[in-house]
From Swiss-Prot:
Signal peptide as annotated in the record: 1-19
Family: Belongs to the neurotoxin 30 (phrixotoxin) family.
Major localization class: secreted
GO cellular component: extracellular region
Molecular-function GO terms, alphabetical: calcium channel regulator activity; potassium channel regulator activity; sodium channel regulator activity; toxin activity
Entry superkingdom: Eukaryota
Protein name as annotated: Kappa-theraphotoxin-Gr2c
Subcellular location: Secreted
Length: 81
């Protein structure tokens, strides 16, 4: 009977740690989405009262990317070789 309670306790401990890990994953995803969309506005002030598109926002001839980014359907970080 003791072995049953030990096994049950270990199973509950594993289930609890798995639930905590899942909660952490969801929290990280929500934080990332908040940073990308909620806290960052689409337009950010640049020099001379112009506005630029941040990373991951769509861009075109009118909506230019911010400095250090290049437009490839959306703004991407510029990689120099």
């Amino acid at each position: 009977m003791k072995a049953f309670f030990v096994i049950l306790g270990l199973a509950l401990l594993c289930a609890y740690s798995f639930a905590l890990e899942e909660q952490d994953q969801l929290s990280l995803r929500n934080d990332l989405l908040t940073v990308m969309f909620a806290e960052n506005s689409e337009l950010t002030p640049e020099t001379e009262e112009r506005y630029c598109q941040k990373w991951m926002w769509t861009c075109d001839e009118e909506r230019k990317c911010c400095e250090g980014l290049v437009c490839r359907l959306w703004c991407k970080k510029k990689i120099e070789w």
